[in-house]
Amino acid sequence: MSGEDEQQEQTIAEDLVVTKYKMGGDIANRVLRSLVEASSSGVSVLSLCEKGDAMIMEETGKIFKKEKEMKKGIAFPTSISVNNCVCHFSPLKSDQDYILKEGDLVKIDLGVHVDGFIANVAHTFVIGVAQGSQVTGRKADVIKAAHLCAEAALRLVKPGNQNTQVTEAWNKVAHSFNCTPIEGMLSHQLKQHVIDGEKTIIQNPTDQQKKDHEKAEFEVHEVYAVDVLVSSGEGKAKDAGQRTTIYKRDPSKQYGLKMKTSRAFFSEVERRFDAMPFTLRAFEDEKKARMGVVECAKHELLQPFNVLYEKEGEFVAQFKFTVLLMPNGPMRITSGPFEPDLYKSEMEVQDAELKALLQSSASRKTQKKKKKKASKTAENATSGETLEENGAGD
């Protein structure tokens, strides 16, 4: 099957492909909102991750029912990373759970695919902000910085622009809030069945990464998952020894697995997930999955998504959206329920050029979106408001 796919790559030049992306985006947005609503003090992260994944499977099960062969479901397992945890925290039943508490800064990250067309989204918020009160201090700084980085990217990721322009804007926005983008993190181009396409945008690269990172120009009919991670600290993410639970198959690697458990595990991975990221939680026998993954990862048949941490006491905020580069402007298909008025920072973007960029109209795109998709008028309206408020407030 994959041979044919490679010859005939389907892009958003086809209406049906756009429809599949938008259906995945709608589901991702709905699941995200329902998880944000369910997040409160005393709630377990494991239970929320399970709820998110179950909801993605349930919702994708309701569409394209007649197409029995079509694969659809989770494109990135629900991960909920709190405070200084940067990303990929998605515990197994056998791992230590985390219970949310008042004041926690929470990042929810998930992805949905319909026929291999991927819609990723991530959102940050704070637990238990009372009606009429505001989040202040470093949490507010880092959330505002990350959100404005995402808004800048929405205006910069368009045909003719370079990936380096986005990287530079992110550094400037983050620094104006005395924050730092997480070093070396990548946003990827998306293609059918491919979550890590070749064109990327790098955050806060080291000198070496700057040299090595491919410069690229955005082109019409491309799709990107734009992923912003900003820290109140130095922006260095480290593996703190937490068990990795999310992996994806690397189709370019081959190896003859020796252990029976590993072989059984790997063939289930191929059958159920193809090259999409998956969680070990999705296996009926978690213990066997934990054993089977070891040999597969050791020989690089599977790539790990390690759980990363910033220094204790710092905060990391994340916003991720998926954008289709349509001929009439970028179309954002995923976003979270961001409420700018909840976050009060003493700092703001000073750079005149950036200010102008952030205030530049995203409503033109919204209008074009409205023509494209009447069904999402409500969401366009909300994203439109956020953009206008941003323009006015910053």
Curated annotation (Swiss-Prot):
Q: How is it modified after translation?
A: Phosphorylated on serine and threonine residues. Phosphorylation is enhanced by HRG treatment. Basal phosphorylation is PKC-dependent and HRG-induced phosphorylation is predominantly PKC-independent. Phosphorylation at Ser-361 by PKC/PRKCD regulates its nucleolar localization. Isoform 2 is polyubiquitinated, leading to proteasomal degradation and phosphorylation by PKC/PRKCD enhances polyubiquitination.
UniProt-annotated stretches for the region Necessary for nucleolar localization: 2-48, 301-394
Pfam families named among the record's database cross-references: Peptidase_M24
Where is the PTM N-acetylserine found along the chain? Answer: 2
Its GO biological process terms? negative regulation of apoptotic process; negative regulation of DNA-templated transcription; positive regulation of cell differentiation; regulation of translation; rRNA processing
Question: Where are the membrane-spanning stretches?
Answer: none
Residue numbers carrying Phosphoserine:
2, 335, 361
InterPro entries per UniProt: Creatinase/aminopeptidase-like (IPR036005), PA2G4 (IPR004545), PA2G4/ARX1 (IPR047113), Pept_M24 (IPR000994), Pept_M24A_MAP2_BS (IPR018349), WH-like_DNA-bd_sf (IPR036388), WH_DNA-bd_sf (IPR036390)
Which residue intervals make up region (Disordered)?
A: 358-394
Residue numbers spanned by region Interaction with RNA:
361-375
Regions of compositional bias (Basic residues) in chain numbering: 365-375
Q: Where is this region: RNA-binding?
A: 46-54
Sorted alphabetically, the keyword list is: Acetylation, Cytoplasm, Isopeptide bond, Nucleus, Phosphoprotein, Repressor, Ribonucleoprotein, RNA-binding, rRNA processing, Transcription, Transcription regulation, Translation regulation, Ubl conjugation
Which positions carry Phosphothreonine?
A: 366, 386
**Entry keyword Ligase:** no
Q: Where is the crosslink of kind Glycyl lysine isopeptide (Lys-Gly) (interchain with G-Cter in SUMO2)?
A: 298
Instruction: List the GO terms this entry assigns under cellular component, sorted alphabetically.
Output: cytoplasm; nucleolus; nucleus; ribonucleoprotein complex
What this chain does, per the record? May play a role in a ERBB3-regulated signal transduction pathway. Seems be involved in growth regulation. Acts a corepressor of the androgen receptor (AR) and is regulated by the ERBB3 ligand neuregulin-1/heregulin (HRG). Inhibits transcription of some E2F1-regulated promoters, probably by recruiting histone acetylase (HAT) activity. Binds RNA. Associates with 28S, 18S and 5.8S mature rRNAs, several rRNA precursors and probably U3 small nucleolar RNA. May be involved in regulation of intermediate and late steps of rRNA processing. May be involved in ribosome assembly.
User: What's the subunit arrangement here?
Assistant: Isoform 2 interacts with the cytoplasmic domain of non-phosphorylated ERBB3; the interaction requires PKC activity. Interacts with AR. Treatment with HRG leads to dissociation from ERBB3 and increases association with AR. Interacts with nucleolin/NCL. Component of a ribonucleoprotein complex containing at least PA2G4, NCL, TOP1, PABPC2, RPLP0, acetylated histone H1 (HIST1H1A or H1F1), histone H1 2/4, RPL4, RPL8, RPL15, RPL18, RPL18A, RPL21, RPL11, RPL12, RPL28, RPL27, RPLP2 and RPL24. Interacts with HDAC2. Interacts with RB1; the interaction is enhanced upon PA2G4 dephosphorylation.
Its protein name is Proliferation-associated protein 2G4
Encoding gene (name): Pa2g4
